[in-house]
Every structure is written in structure tokens, then in C-alpha cells.
Regions:
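Basic/polar N-terminal segments that are highly enriched at the extreme N-terminus
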Residues: 1-13, 311
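Cofactor-binding active-site loop characterized by glycine-rich and histidine/acidic residues
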Residues: 8-140, 153-160, 170-174
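Conserved thiamine diphosphate
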Residues: 14-18, 27, 107, 157-209, ...
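Structural signal for hydrophobic packing residues in well-ordered secondary-structure cores
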Residues: 44-51, 91-97, 175, 185-188, ...
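Short gly/pro/ser/thr-enriched loop/turn and capping motifs at secondary-structure boundaries
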Residues: 61, 145-150, 226-228
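Short, conserved beta-strand edge motifs with alternating hydrophobic and charged residues
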Residues: 142, 193-195, 218-222
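Flexible, low-complexity linker and terminal segments
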Residues: 223-311
Length: 311
């Protein structure tokens, strides 16, 4: 593996420090303006070419279609619920090759799971928990587009309250988004962080930190989805910035070594949540034909309550 930065150091202090050569090829079969693809591109650039991706069935499956895969490295495709088990097999095989001196330690690979929110929040959560319990040395990346985007944007455990999906009526999703960050932290991995591709420096620093550590390291990345959320592809980056600026998507990290949650980007004052919601078709029913003041106030109150608890 390439040399890792010392603890507390970062290569990424300014935008100019971000990689200028991209490892993920262009011309993929993904939807135009895919926020998940943007994040994967940025993550891959920081991790480097010596990476094995283990993909849970989902949107990113479209990247693995032979002979059009844009990855320079290796890719393993698994069913939706078992990507961490696939990562265990890859990690065990690499460790065995190193132990038998068939693979020099400096040529070892990072094992990275790619999974959507359907797998991460739902049917694959038990496999992830078991991998953390075993102390599996891997990076887990959830690209969270807040629904089953690959099959038509049905609601998932990641869908926010009131968002319209293919499985909910005109009033939108009646439930609330599951706090996967807290669930992962409760399992006791080495590192957990939230991120978004629209904040590339923050994302790069977190990927760099995750790569430096050992054990189970988990990244929860919001992935604005023009197809499922209802906005123009060219608005993807702005939607991502608004998710952070309104406080709807907190950027934070937790390390087992410190046991503390640290917020890495805090906007004060925050923009009203409406500025984020009104740009998305999945929330249009909150504004048209009449403004739903009660539900909008409920959503804003939920965001305010979260930040009231942040020191």
C-alpha cells in the first residue's frame, strides 16, 4: 500500500490539494447528475488504485457491467444483504496471500464495500453488525439516496419524513429516517463519519482518516438523486450544499479512540429547511397547491431539535 499520513495530519487543506487525476472512468451507465457516483469518484481518488470494491446489489451495480466497467481495480458483485460477508472473504484471501509471501505487504489492497441505503439501513444491516463484531478490516461506504433508487425509488428506512416515493401516497412517507450513524457507533467500529460529495474537502479528509485506521470504518454519504428526488441533474451539487447549509444533513465523525462525536462543518446561522425541500419534486406536495405549514414546521422543528443538542 502507499504511505499513509501520520495521525492528525491531512494532505487536503485546500481544494487544490484534491487529486487532479481521476481513477473512475467517464461515460458510465449511471443517471446524469448522480450524487452517489460523484461521491464514489471522490472516494476512489483518495483511496487509490489498490482497492477492491465489494458491491451490494443497487444503483452502483451499473458500474460493473462488462466490458464497460470504469474501475481500474477489482470489483466483486454480491447480493444486496451480504456485501460485508463478501468483503470478509476478500480480506481473508489477501491476508492468506500475504502470510504465505505470495503477495508483498506493500502490495496489499484496501477492501471497500459499496452499498446503497436499502442494503445499509435494512436487509444488510445484520451482516454489517456481524462484520464489526468480528473486527473486519474494511471500509464500508453507504451511498444514501434515501430510497430504493435502482428499482424506482420505493421508500427505505433512510427515507425522510414526508418525502414522496413510489410506495407512499400523495402525503409522502409517514415514518422518519433511521439514525444509522448512531446504530453504527453503538456497534463499536474504529470510525464512523457522514459526508457528501458536494463538500469534497470534508469527504477527502474523512476517507484519508478512514484509510489510515484499521478495523471496521464506515462512511455514510448522502447521495442526491435527480431521478428519485425530482430535480435537474445540473442542480445536484447545489442540492447537496443546501442539505448541509440547512442542517438537514449534519457532517460529523466518531472515532473509537476518543469516543466523541465531532461535527466537522457547522453553518451558523443555518438556512431554513424549506430552501432545501422546495428544490425537490419529492417534497412538492408540501408547497403546491397550498403550502403545508404544519408539516414544514414539523420538519424544521426536527432539524432545530437536533442542532440544539450539539454543543
Amino acid at each position: 500500500m502507499s504511505e499513509r499520513p501520520a495521525a492528525g495530519e491531512t494532505r487536503f487543506r485546500r481544494m487544490n490539494d484534491l487529486p487532479s487525476t481521476h481513477l473512475l472512468g467517464a461515460g458510465t451507465a449511471m443517471c446524469a447528475g448522480c450524487g452517489g457516483l460523484q461521491a464514489v469518484q471522490e472516494i476512489y481518488d483518495v483511496l487509490g488504485e489498490r482497492t477492491v470494491f465489494v458491491n451490494a446489489a443497487g444503483c452502483m451495480t451499473l458500474l460493473s457491467i462488462y466490458p464497460f466497467t470504469p474501475f481500474r481495480g477489482s470489483w466483486l458483485y454480491t447480493a444486496m444483504a451480504c456485501a460485508p460477508a463478501g468483503a470478509q472473504g476478500v480480506r481473508d484471501a489477501l491476508d492468506l496471500l500475504v502470510a504465505k509471501r505470495r503477495l508483498p505487504p506493500e502490495e496489499d489492497l484496501d477492501v471497500v464495500v459499496l452499498a446503497g441505503d436499502g442494503a445499509s439501513y435494512g436487509m444488510g444491516l445484520s451482516a454489517t453488525s456481524a462484520a464489526i463484531d468480528r473486527g473486519l478490516d474494511f471500509v464500508y461506504v453507504c451511498y444514501d439516496n434515501e430510497g430504493y433508487g435502482n428499482t424506482g425509488q420505493q421508500s427505505s428506512a433512510a427515507t425522510p419524513h414526508a418525502a414522496r416515493t413510489a410506495t407512499d401516497g400523495g402525503a409522502g412517507f409517514p415514518g422518519a429516517k433511521k439514525d444509522l450513524f448512531a446504530i453504527w457507533v453503538a456497534n463499536g467500529p474504529s470510525y464512523v463519519a457522514t459526508a457528501i460529495g458536494a463538500e469534497p474537502l470534508d469527504l477527502a479528509r474523512k476517507v484519508e482518516k478512514a484509510r489510515r485506521l484499521r478495523g471496521s470504518r464506515l462512511l455514510l454519504v448522502l447521495a442526491p438523486c435527480p431521478t428519485g428526488w425530482g430535480f435537474e441533474p445540473g442542480e445536484m451539487a447545489e442540492i447537496g450544499r443546501l442539505a448541509v447549509a440547512t442542517g438537514f444533513w449534519p457532517l460529523k465523525e466518531w472515532e473509537r479512540a476518543s469516543g466523541r462525536v465531532v461535527h466537522t462543518k457547522v453553518r451558523r446561522p443555518r438556512l431554513p429547511v424549506e430552501e432545501y425541500l422546495r428544490r425537490q419534486g419529492r417534497f412538492r406536495h408540501l408547497f403546491e397547491p397550498a403550502r403545508d405549514a404544519r408539516r414544514l414546521a414539523e420538519i424544521q422543528a426536527g432539524v432545530d431539535a437536533y442542532w440544539a443538542g450539539v454543543a
